[in-house]
């Protein structure tokens, strides 16, 4: 019986593949894959044909895996580097975005506010800013209707007087405003003499009203000041008429009085007594604080009213003489009698 044929496992030098060949006496063999003829150098296994074929498959599989390892490693390294590059790029992009986001948001918030305000203004909605804590609340607006004049205190206002006053002689005097003048006009109803004007503010501001019940302005009240001749005027006596004659200016007579003049007095003294005894149209107001004395009973050098009384500040206005001359108070009370100094 013939022996079994043996086989060998050989490797080609050109294609680097493993293959099984039968054992022969010649040393030369040809590659089944690439067809290159080559000599026998090394046997990687020897046995039956089936065993050699299984062994060749295993060797070629391992050779293929080994050859694929560098490629895989290269691919893995390349992929890893690419991933790293991609990661670095992404990280850089994220950082750039993070850096750019604050600046963009900082500007965008103002733009959004402006756009919102513009939209609200377009729709007709307006907002009022709240006042800061430092700013005070605005006070009430100045009204032009309020008076700008200085307020008059009631302490300086004189006591009111009635509109219709009846003097001692029975003649009734009425108040009445006169156009173009700030004072009052007294009209005597029962007398035929003209009216006298009064510029003193004897009545209070509430009583100084005209026919239309209109208050006189404070300027008109201020202009109704007293006259410098008011202290020489005497209050009216009992009479039914008003004398409008002006008192004459008196001068002192340097010559001594004669025996005829001693009884009747000098003409100037008589004129002075007549002028002082004649009543005026001024109404005696309730401010008089002392009784009135006649011309002969008054002392020389003193007036009939005290300087501290309201008559010193303001009183009835007397019509001045056409040619006023300086007079002495002593001349107003000359009796015309001579007195001997030796007695």
Curated annotation (Swiss-Prot):
InterPro entries: MRNIP, MRNIP_N
Molecular function GO labels: chromatin binding
Stored Pfam families: MRNIP
Residues in coiled coil: none
Primary location recorded for the protein, binned into one broad class: nucleus
Motif (Nuclear localization signal (NLS)): 148-151
Compartments where found: Nucleus; Nucleus, Nucleoplasm
Domain of life: Eukaryota
Region of interest (Necessary for the association with the MRN complex), residue spans: 213-237
Alphabetically ordered keywords of this record: DNA damage, DNA repair, Nucleus, Phosphoprotein
Keyword DNA damage: yes
One GO cellular component term: nucleoplasm
Residue positions where Phosphoserine is found in the record: 100, 115
Subunit organization: Associates with the MRE11-RAD50-NBN (MRN) damage-sensing complex; this association is constitutive. Interacts with MRE11. Interacts with NBN. Interacts with RAD50.
Role: Plays a role in the cellular response to DNA damage and the maintenance of genome stability through its association with the MRN damage-sensing complex. Promotes chromatin loading and activity of the MRN complex to facilitate subsequent ATM-mediated DNA damage response signaling and DNA repair.
Similarity annotation: Belongs to the MRNIP family.
Full protein name: MRN complex-interacting protein
Species annotation: Homo sapiens
